[in-house]
């Protein structure tokens, strides 16, 4: 299901620079002042400063660990392929749940209907009750810097 970005707060608190920037989620490309892809996204810039996660190298090291002989160890008896699948499945389910939570909070603050009976969303409800003095200005705000040629999105 495609995420439809709610617009209540961005319309209410419109900024002239909002009209200069757009984002294509699939290829992760910003267009700024008509320049498509000429600005580096902050996400891309951040990733350039860290080594990519190397599951194979980490699992190879784990398989040599004495822990792998312990029947109580959660990876005991698992092959490299099985461990990698466990990690991939956990990554995917966590990402899906996190994205849903993020979107539901965004919908809530933009006066959209939200159907989420998860424990985590109830924690968000508690946060709202405990912090009723906080008033959202924007839930997402696309920004850019002309000289640095950086673009990104600030999320609440």
Model-assigned labels for residue ranges:
Residues 1-100:
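Charged, glycine-rich intrinsically disordered N-terminal tails and low-complexity linkers that flank
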């Amino acid at each position: 299901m495609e995420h439809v970005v709610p617009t209540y707060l961005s319309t209410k608190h419109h900024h002239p620079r909002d009209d200069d920037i757009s984002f294509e989620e699939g290829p992760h490309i910003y267009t700024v002042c008509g320049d498509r892809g000429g600005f580096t996204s902050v996400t891309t810039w951040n990733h350039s400063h860290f080594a990519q996660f190397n599951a194979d190298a980490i699992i190879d090291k784990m398989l040599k660990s004495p822990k792998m002989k312990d029947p109580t160890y959660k990876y005991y008896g698992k092959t490299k392929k099985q461990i990698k699948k466990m990690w991939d499945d956990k990554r995917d389910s966590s990402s899906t749940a996190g994205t849903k939570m993020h979107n539901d909070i965004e919908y809530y603050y933009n006066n959209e209907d939200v159907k989420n009976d998860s424990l985590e969303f109830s924690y968000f409800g508690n946060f709202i009750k405990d912090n009723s003095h906080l008033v959202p200005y924007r839930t997402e705000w696309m920004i850019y810097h002309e000289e640095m040629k950086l673009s990104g999105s600030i999320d609440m």
